[in-house]
C-alpha cells in the first residue's frame, strides 16, 4: 500500500545489482539501519512509511531486522553519525528519503554498505535507488493534457528535494511541448524552504487539474 509493484521490483533488482546481499552474507549482527528524516515521518506522510514496511517484510525473508532511526532537524543541521551506525551494531545502512548533503557526507567514514533510497548526490559516489520522477510526471501531465486540460497545477517546493524538482521538470516539459504557458498562480507550495508545513494557499482561479 502506497508503493507500486514497479517500485518494489526496482528496489529488489537494483539491490541485487549492487551486490548488497553479498555484503550482508558476511554480516555479524543481523541488523540493517534505516535512517529517515523527521519530516517524512509526520502523521500525514505515508509514502516513506509504506516503503519502510515493505523493506522490513523483505528483510525478514532474509533473516535480517531493520532498525529505524528518525533523524531530527537538529541532527541534519549538526551532522554526525548516530551511534547506531557502527559495524558492531548494524551490517549496512539505508538512507530513506533525502537527507541534507552534509549529513550524508558525515556518514561516509563509517565504512558500512550504504544505499540512498529515493534520492542521490552524484558527487558522493554512493549507490542509490531512484524512481524516474521526470518521466513519471511528464507522462502524468501529458495524460491530463490529452484529456483537454490546459490549466494544470503543480504542488511542491522544488527547493526541498531532488524528487520534487525532477517532478517539476517533467511537468514543465509536458506543458512546454504542448505549447501551454506556465502560470505561476498554479505552482503551489505546501512547505516553506525550511520544510515546515505552511498549508496550501489556493489561487482565486483554480486549475482544472493537478
Show where each model-derived region lies.
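Short beta->alpha connector loops
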Residues: 72-76, 95-101
Amino acid at each position: 500500500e502506497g508503493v507500486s509493484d514497479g517500485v518494489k521490483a526496482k528496489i529488489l533488482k537494483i539491490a541485487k545489482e549492487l551486490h548488497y546481499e553479498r555484503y550482508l552474507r558476511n554480516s555479524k549482527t543481523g541488523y540493517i539501519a534505516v535512517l529517515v528524516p523527521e519530516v517524512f515521518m509526520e502523521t500525514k506522510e505515508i509514502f516513506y512509511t509504506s516503503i519502510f514496511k515493505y523493506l522490513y517484510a523483505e528483510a525478514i525473508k532474509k533473516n535480517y531486522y531493520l532498525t529505524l532511526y528518525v533523524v531530527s532537524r537538529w541532527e541534519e543541521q549538526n551532522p554526525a553519525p548516530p551511534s547506531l551506525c557502527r559495524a558492531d551494531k548494524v551490517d549496512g545502512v539505508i538512507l530513506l528519503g533525502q537527507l541534507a548533503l552534509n549529513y550524508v557526507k558525515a556518514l561516509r567514514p563509517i565504512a558500512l554498505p550504504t544505499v540512498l533510497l529515493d534520492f542521490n548526490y552524484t558527487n558522493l559516489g554512493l549507490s542509490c535507488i531512484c524512481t524516474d520522477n521526470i518521466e513519471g510526471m511528464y507522462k502524468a501531465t501529458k495524460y491530463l493534457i490529452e484529456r483537454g486540460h490546459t490549466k494544470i497545477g503543480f504542488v511542491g517546493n522544488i527547493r526541498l528535494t531532488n524528487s520534487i524538482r525532477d517532478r517539476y521538470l517533467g511537468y514543465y516539459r509536458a506543458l512546454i511541448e504542448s505549447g501551454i504557458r506556465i502560470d505561476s498562480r498554479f505552482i503551489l507550495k505546501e512547505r516553506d524552504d525550511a520544510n515546515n508545513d505552511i498549508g496550501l494557499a489556493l489561487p482565486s482561479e483554480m486549475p482544472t487539474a493537478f
